């Protein structure tokens, strides 16, 4: 399968299954578009009719171009065969290990964001803080079910996890003890709205957390429309100085500013640029997840605006990078020179199998977006996964699980997409959230274009960087530990 598009002055041709990316002139671009359905003579005639007035386009040149396209096809760089379908289901049929937990240490929050999918941190239930005993058992559950995998991921989540900070500190200390006993390496992430950040929190996170996610929606007027406290007061002025101090002290350790855009700020690139101008360089901005009847929900009329915004973002990122003011956007982070192995590219995020959410009471759900839905209760941290039917349903979420995905050029980049988004949009985790698909494909086009621009600049300096699909390391297939 081949996908062609034009963006920022580049004619880009992507071969889906090999991962090869070709940057060509307009003549070759048109030749490739005609190649599958037309003879060489038909292509030559059409190209001469379109470009015949140009002295650099002759029949000899066109036939050489067609020969070059044929050579690329024969060498698996264009219209390469799809050999991954069987691998997708074989991979999911293996014995799984649990590698990550989203630990809901607080079903309570000190903000009252109106668009919150978690019902202001309560997940449509009671307010609660996780006890140390439950947290400890959750870590034991993770260790017991992680097999030979060494690196284990734990995200302290809520609600607002810093409302249970003392328990978090105690639990991390426990995990550090268990690392030595079981030859494991815990990597912690803290996701916070920032209200309770102080020097103690900063020092702890910079010592113990592999990553931190800091919630900010961008411009003050945008952030304070939704991210308010229980009295309706905006949070921007309270949290931005804390975030700036946090990031300053964090040095070169991982962090992300994580925002949400809605129908009310479809010009969300201005919020990203605002955060960059505040000094933040690791940025993410997500489309809102809410009921379609909610006034903040994105509409069909918003879609072309959002696509244009992603293009504006990509072009500005290239510009700022050249000026020495570059920043990272999470959804444009792709590695075309190697990247994830094929098993990771055809399987989904691992929700419900390798990744689960744990409530303050110890219940297990496929991920944080399913918490509170009795249909998707997997079990608990004492008895393990008892609802094997749900686990098996999630096992078969992959890039080939949906008929619509099998013919999509982006399937090896999205791995089948988000099961929760599909469920909330269609009522089934194997449904297709078409709106999200459109946004994802535009993000991938922009991300690839940025890589093309980077490679063009390197090529101008005499540095060649091949672009190809991630290889198969076999670690996942063999059940071995990997990153």
Question: Where do the protein language model's features map onto the residues?
Answer:
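Acidic, low-complexity/disordered tracts enriched in E/D and polar residues
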Residues: 1-35
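Radical SAM/AdoMet-radical enzyme domain recognition
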Residues: 135, 139-155, 164-288
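Short acidic, hydrophobic short linear motifs in intrinsically disordered regions
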Residues: 38-51
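C-terminal accessory region of radical SAM enzymes
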Residues: 305-338, 368-415
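Local cysteine-cluster metal-coordination motifs and their immediate loop/turn environment
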Residues: 108-118, 366-369, 403-420, 474-481
